Every structure is written in C-alpha cells, then in structure tokens.
Amino acid sequence: MILYSLKDVTFGYGNEPVIERLTLDLHAGQLIGITGPNGAAKSTLLKLILGLVKPWSGTVKHCSSPEIKGGVNVSYVPQQVSSFNNGFPSKVIELVRSGCYSRLGLFRRFTKEQEQLVERSLKQVGMWEYRNRKIGELSGGQKQRICIARALAQDPEILILDEPASGMDQGSRLGLYELLRHYVDNHGKTVLMVTHGLEETGVFLDTLITLERKESEGWRCLVTNSCSERFGRED
C-alpha cells in the first residue's frame, strides 16, 4: 500500500531550488532508507514528507488524506538533538513520558499500559538504567537514544528519523537497526530514515532511495533499490 506519494515536487531556499520535479511513492510496512552525498537535500525531503515545509510546486500526499498531517500517528526525530545542554533540567524518564502526552486527556493520567510502554521504549534503546539521570549529563549518542525512545513511546504508525545513529558506537548502531527491523516486522509499522552507513544498514532495509544530482539540475534523480535483492536480506 502506498503511504506517501510525492509528484513533481520542487522546493528550495531563497531563489535556489534544492529538489526539482521529484516523484516518489513510499510504501507502508517497510524500513526505508534515504541516502545521498552531503548536501543532497535528504533532511529537506523528510521535512517535505512531514509537511514542515511546503513545496513550491507539485504535491505531497498521504494515502488517507489530501495532505500529510502529523500528530499521534507520526513521530519524528531530527538530526540535531544537541539543544539538550548541560543545564537541561529534565530527567530522562520525564522526556520519554512526554511522548505519551498526545494520547492523554487534559489531566494527563498515565495508564499502566502507558507506563509499560515508556519502560519498554527505554529498555529497547538500552537507556532504562539512565532513567533518573538528567538529560544534560548525557553524551550526544545517549541523547539521541532517548529521543528515539520518546518517539517509540508515542507508538506511532510511522517513525521518521534523520540520521538516528549519529554519535553512537558501532554496537549501539547495529542494535538500533535491529530494533527498527523488529519494529517493522513485529508491529506492522513503517520506518523512514536518512542513513550514510550502507555497509551497516543495507542488510536491514527493505528499500533504499538514493538522491542523485543531474548536471545543472537539483536533487531529483532517484535510484530505488530493493535491499533484499541488493544486500541479500531474506524477506
């Protein structure tokens, strides 16, 4: 089933287009990677899909609505989480619990199931033992992991991640990719992420989208590969 459909999309900054006449369909129930050289507008593509920016021309649609709408069904983890500086007062578990707020009523009463979801999300990213630590005391990679835990605590149908393994060591990166693969296969979710390390991620992906530039044109030439064929992953 097509989840997102982009047709002839052009977008840029100032007077300079960075994406031109891009047409792309993204399918539900897959772990999808987006790759390309530095400056290939990968993060911009995510923002277009999320509806955070509007295309200059063309259309960006969700399969069930005229325009993409966020909310409880979509969680987004941006590339930069360094805004949690050393003085950031909140504890890890407080931030992850905030991922459930959109599903709560006015008085934000947590159910037992929601508390279990918060605990499970922290354990999935290996941060449960840090739950009472202040966020400002954590390393960059640890901050990245708790932001992913917060997104998982929202229990979204669609999880969108911009270079989620940034700042992590190899063991943590591979653990994250295994987690995302499990999230898709066992919970019927869709994950879309920007990635550079294809030697690590390729075996976990269903589909890889490569942004390329044609001479004197913006980033619009797409090469879409089935990763089960390219990297030998069994479906």
Task: Identify the role of each PLM range.
Residues K134-L138:
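Conserved ABC ATPase signature
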Residues L50:
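Helix-to-loop junction immediately C-terminal to a conserved catalytic motif
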Residues D155:
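Conserved catalytic motifs of ABC-family nucleotide-binding domains
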Residues R97, K112-Y130:
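Conserved ABC ATPase "signature" region
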Residues G58-V72:
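Conserved ABC transporter NBD signature motif
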